[in-house]
Structure formats: C-alpha cells, structure tokens
C-alpha cells in the first residue's frame, strides 16, 4: 500500500487551518464518487481497474505477441496522454541497456513533437530492421501523431507491400474519426479508446496496456496493482488515513500559503517519465481559470548540482513530493582499495543503494531546513504492480484535488489556442483570414 510520509512537511502546517482542507478534500472525494461533479462524463477511469475484461486483456497480449514475434522494433505513435503513461512504465521497468531481437523488440516513440531530425534518423534506423507500428489517437487528426503516422505508413508500405497493414495496430475511437476510417479501409487491427476516459487518465485502457504488452511487460501485474489500491482508496473515508485524500489536502493547503509550484522529485532515473506523465496529469487537470499548482520535476541527485541551489535558497514558492520506492534492488557494493587514492574507503561495504538513500534523506533534511515542505510518497518498489498502484493513486488524487480547487479536472480547453494559431499560419482550409491577421501581428504591423 502506498503511504504518504509527512515528517518533513508537517512543521509547515497550521493544524487548525489544515482541518478545513482535510474536510474539503473528503467532500471532493465524495463528489467524485457521486458522479455529480464537473466533467462526470469522463469518469470511466474511476472503476476501470475492476471492470477490465479478461477477454480484452487476452486479446491485447495475443496481438502484442504477434507484433513482438515479427518485429525488431515497435514504434508507438502518440502524444500527451496517448503516449506518456506507457512510456513512463516502460522507462521505469525495462533494463537501461538491452539487446533487441525478434521476440524482444526495441520500443521507440514518435508523434510526440514536430522535430524533423528525430523522425528522419528513426526512419533511417528502421530501413534495415523489421518493425511494426502502434498508432494511438482518438480522432486521428491530432497534428503531431497524424504526421508521424503518415511517414511511417509510407515506410511500411514501401518495405512490406501488401502485408504492411498486418504490422499496424490502431488504438482509436470505436466507431468514428479519421484514424478509425483509415483502419477500416486498410484493415488494421484495432483497439478502442473508451469515450468516457480522457487521454491523461487512459493508461489502464489499451492506450497504455498495448504498448506495455508489446514491450513484454506483464500487464496483469500492472492492472493488479491498480486494483489493489482502488479497493483501499475507495473504501477509506478518513482523509488522514486515505493517502490520496491526504495528499490532495496538503497540495491545496500549500497553494493557499503561496506555494504555487510543486516539484515531483526522484532519486531513481528510471522514474523520470513517471514525472513527465504526472506533469501532464496535474497540469492539464488543474491549470485553468487562472488557478492551479504548476507541476515541475527534478531528477536527483543530478539536479541537485543545477537547480538544487534555487530549491535551497531561492524564492519560497515551492513544495516537494519525493517518489520513494522502498526497495530498489541495489546489489553494487563499494569495496576498499589499498591506497584509497579517491578517499572513498569510508564507504566500503555499503551498497550504492544505501549511499543513494542517505543522499535522499540528507536532501530532505536540507530542503526542509531551507523552508521547503517535503512530502514523501512511499511505495514498495519499481515493479509493474507497484507502478499500477502509483499511477492510479495519482489519477485519484488529481481528481480530488481538482474538485477541491473548484475546476473541472477532466477538460483542457486551453490546449486549442496554439493549435488554432498553427493551423492559421499553415494555411489550413477555413483558417485563411486568421492566418493573414497573425502574420501581420508577427511582423509588428
């Protein structure tokens, strides 16, 4: 079970004032379960772990294995919630260094930006390798993945001819949209994105599960982790004993005290993309109506040598939440040397994991002493099962926190602003007048 440790944060809290935030958080949790709050049409994720059908899990595993058996590389095309969840789990659980082969393919991502060098080099890399594609898009019209899929579909057809379609799996709408039509015409295997689950809450749908299965991750264990924590979070009505409600209360309390930035920190580089996924989850869910905590992330100890100075002595507008797995399976032991030229013999006999843990504790003490409240999210280890717990915990916490803030945690109206400008500047049909106006603005006219 996940635990929220507050030993380096509680001294920053006025207990009487905090009571009202606990009450509000539990009220928001009840609103969530009433299905009467803002955005309630997108609550399909709430009970999803216990509603996933075994037949769908089995189909995902079987289709993923077919691609694994025929591919040295699988390219996952998506952006935002259509890619960050699966990448977070893959980066956390797969070996840092591994050899790929048919049956154990490399996983690369595309369609999450518009930079041409990356796509060009990836396409060149694939020319002499067998590869397949999982394209993920509800509509099929999101610019970045749509462009990437056009390029990789052309490469597949050139390389495999009539059999190219067998190397594409499309995760999209059940019945409508550009990608669904494309899939029907070409005969792609498809999986469905539920209508009542938004992208950033979709890691437990085929959006997240298929790429995990394609990488060889045991998705049943990932689902099991989310199922286990769901039972606890849904049942516990005491906001102090429910870690998600407790976390939400702390977040909004610190915001009320002028701490507008939350840093999600880790001491394990494999967790970096958990932070990237978390930033989208909270940023899109809470950043609206001129409200919200800005979600940032840091990778320690690396960033202690760059941003650590600001955290220690900069403006006191921060609080930290530290991802803290209890077991990191460290087996590197530091041995003494006869000459001790590097002056490190004082560490002899210690595992590198022990050294990292002392760095973590020393950092928490220093930051708290410097005026930065630090929460610790304690979970068992960096395994698919534990990550299933962590990701459902954050989804549940985010919904509660958003309701406490008074916003709809399930929409993202602001993301269309840049798209409209981009379409106008690219002369998309229907945007011509806006394009002329924007070009004049850019030129200062």
Curated annotation (Swiss-Prot):
Q: Its catalytic activity?
A: alpha-D-glucose 6-phosphate = beta-D-fructose 6-phosphate
Enzyme type, top EC level: isomerase
Write out the annotated subcellular location. Cytoplasm
Q: Which GO terms describe its cellular component?
A: cytosol
Q: In which pathway does it act?
A: Carbohydrate biosynthesis; gluconeogenesis; Carbohydrate degradation; glycolysis; D-glyceraldehyde 3-phosphate and glycerone phosphate from D-glucose: step 2/4
- Pfam families listed in its UniProt record: PGI
Superkingdom in the source lineage = Bacteria
The record places the active site at 284 (proton donor), 305, 419
Keyword annotations of the record: Cytoplasm, Gluconeogenesis, Glycolysis, Isomerase
Provide the primary localization.
Answer: cytoplasm
Q: What is its EC number?
A: 5.3.1.9
Give GO MF terms, alphabetically.
carbohydrate derivative binding; glucose-6-phosphate isomerase activity; monosaccharide binding
Q: Which GO terms describe its biological process?
A: gluconeogenesis; glucose 6-phosphate metabolic process; glycolytic process
Q: What family is this? A: Belongs to the GPI family.
What role is this protein assigned?
Answer: Catalyzes the reversible isomerization of glucose-6-phosphate to fructose-6-phosphate.
Q: What is this protein called?
A: Glucose-6-phosphate isomerase
The species is: Leptospira borgpetersenii serovar Hardjo-bovis (strain JB197)
Give me the gene this protein comes from.
pgi
């Amino acid at each position: 079970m996940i635990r929220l440790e507050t030993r380096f944060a509680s001294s920053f809290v006025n207990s009487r004032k905090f009571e009202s935030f606990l009450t509000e958080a539990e009220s928001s949790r009840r609103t969530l379960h009433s299905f009467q709050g803002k955005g309630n049409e997108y609550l399909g994720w709430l009970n999803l772990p216990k509603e996933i059908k075994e037949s769908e899990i089995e189909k995902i595993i079987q289709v993923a294995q077919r691609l694994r058996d025929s591919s040295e590389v699988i390219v996952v095309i998506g952006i935002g919630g259509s890619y960050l969840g699966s990448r977070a789990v893959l980066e956390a659980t797969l070996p840092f260094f591994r050899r790929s082969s048919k049956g154990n393919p490399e996983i690369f991502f595309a369609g999450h930006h518009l930079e041409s060098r990356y796509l060009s080099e990836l396409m060149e890399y694939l020319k002499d390798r067998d590869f397949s594609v999982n394209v993920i898009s509800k509509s099929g019209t999101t610019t970045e993945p749509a462009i990437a899929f056009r390029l990789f579909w052309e490469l597949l057809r050139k390389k495999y001819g009539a059999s190219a379609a067998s190397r594409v799996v499309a995760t999209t709408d059940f019945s409508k949209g550009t990608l669904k039509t494309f899939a029907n015409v070409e005969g792609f295997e498809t999986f469905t994105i539920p209508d009542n689950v938004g992208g950033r809450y979709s890691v437990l749908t085929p959006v997240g599960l298929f790429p995990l299965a394609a990488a060889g991750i045991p998705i049943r264990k990932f689902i099991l982790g989310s199922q286990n924590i769901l039972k606890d979070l849904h049942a516990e009505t005491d906001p102090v004993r429910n870690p998600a409600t407790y976390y939400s209360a702390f977040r909004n309390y610190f915001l009320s005290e002028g701490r507008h930035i939350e840093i999600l920190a880790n001491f394990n580089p494999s967790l970096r993309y958990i932070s990237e996924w978390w930033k989208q989850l909270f940023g899109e869910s809470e950043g609206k109506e001129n409200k919200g905590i800005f979600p940032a992330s840091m990778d320690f100890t690396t960033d202690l040598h760059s941003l650590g100075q600001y955290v220690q002595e900069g403006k006191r507008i921060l609080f930290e939440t530290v991802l803290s797995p209890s077991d990191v399976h460290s087996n590197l032991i530091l041995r003494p040397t006869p000459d001790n030229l590097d002056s490190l013999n004082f560490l002899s006999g210690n595992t590198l994991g022990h050294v990292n843990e002392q760095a973590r504790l020393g950092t928490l003490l220093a930051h708290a002493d410097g005026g930065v409240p630090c929460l610790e999210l304690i979970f068992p280890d960096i395994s698919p099962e534990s990550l299933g717990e962590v990701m459902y915990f954050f989804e549940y916490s985010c919904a509660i926190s958003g309701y406490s803030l008074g916003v709809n945690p399930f929409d993202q109206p602001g993301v269309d602003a840049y798209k409209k400008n981009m379409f106008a500047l690219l002369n998309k049909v229907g945007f011509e007048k806006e394009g002329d106006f924007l070009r004049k603005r850019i030129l200062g006219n």
